[in-house]
Amino acid sequence: MIGKLSGTLDDKNPPQVIVDCHGVGYEVLVPMSTFYNLPELGARVSLLTHFVVREDAQILYGFATSQERAAFRELIKISGVGPRTALSVLSGMSVAELAQAVTLQEGGRLIKVPGIGKKTAERLLLELKGKLGPDIGVAASVANDSQADILQALLALGYSDKEAAAALKALPSDVGVSEGIRLALRALGK
């Protein structure tokens, strides 16, 4: 398996790039988030990759971050979601946005991605719940350290990710930890 490519960026044509590694040019399909962050042609580039072998093709998918690659791998494990659809999802939203959509069970955000219908969005929400990593989900909904502490407190008290994130969203951004927990508990108690 090819896990990483480092070389010279020879060509950029969305969603495909060609990376020259010591005279061998590798075609790599990348999500748009990675594509927009690529350097100029002729510059050195390093991509984490996922290698897919099919009966009729061998395809490399490249990612700028390990979180993107991990999300891609989780997406392709889902029945009915292939590498192209997974690439489309990661092109349509960042990993943090995907994690937040899954945490808050917002299928409407997923439906906006080309190639994702209502049933596929529901399947993604169900299958990805808890699989994108707690650090990604927390980072998506937390603006500062006090909000992170409030979120952790609510989760420790047994509230679901969705309930805790919704309560956190309703709080003022400059609220302190103890006051934030009190306000969140009051909101959740209604």
UniProtKB/Swiss-Prot annotation:
InterPro entries: DNA_helicase_Holl-junc_RuvA_I (IPR013849), Hlx-hairpin-Hlx_DNA-bd_motif (IPR003583), NA-bd_OB-fold (IPR012340), RuvA (IPR000085), RuvA_2-like (IPR010994), RuvA_C (IPR011114), RuvA_C_sf (IPR036267). GO terms for cellular component: cytoplasm; Holliday junction helicase complex; Holliday junction resolvase complex. Residues 65-137 are annotated as: Domain II. It is found in: Cytoplasm. SMART domains: HhH1 (SM00278). It comes from the Bacteria. It holds the Pfam family HHH_5. Residues 142-190 are annotated as: Domain III. Residues 137-141 are annotated as: Flexible linker. Disulfide bonds: none annotated. Coiled coil: none annotated. The keyword NAD does not apply. Keywords: Cytoplasm, DNA damage, DNA recombination, DNA repair, DNA-binding. Residues 1-64 are annotated as: Domain I. One of its GO terms (molecular function) is four-way junction helicase activity. One of its GO terms (biological process) is DNA repair. Has three domains with a flexible linker between the domains II and III and assumes an 'L' shape. Domain III is highly mobile and contacts RuvB. Belongs to the RuvA family. Homotetramer. Forms an RuvA(8)-RuvB(12)-Holliday junction (HJ) complex. HJ DNA is sandwiched between 2 RuvA tetramers; dsDNA enters through RuvA and exits via RuvB. An RuvB hexamer assembles on each DNA strand where it exits the tetramer. Each RuvB hexamer is contacted by two RuvA subunits (via domain III) on 2 adjacent RuvB subunits; this complex drives branch migration. In the full resolvosome a probable DNA-RuvA(4)-RuvB(12)-RuvC(2) complex forms which resolves the HJ. The RuvA-RuvB-RuvC complex processes Holliday junction (HJ) DNA during genetic recombination and DNA repair, while the RuvA-RuvB complex plays an important role in the rescue of blocked DNA replication forks via replication fork reversal (RFR). RuvA specifically binds to HJ cruciform DNA, conferring on it an open structure. The RuvB hexamer acts as an ATP-dependent pump, pulling dsDNA into and through the RuvAB complex. HJ branch migration allows RuvC to scan DNA until it finds its consensus sequence, where it cleaves and resolves the cruciform DNA. NCBIfam families: ruvA (TIGR00084). This is Holliday junction branch migration complex subunit RuvA. It comes from Albidiferax ferrireducens (strain ATCC BAA-621 / DSM 15236 / T118) (Rhodoferax ferrireducens). The lineage of its organism: Bacteria, Pseudomonadati, Pseudomonadota, Betaproteobacteria, Burkholderiales. The gene is ruvA.
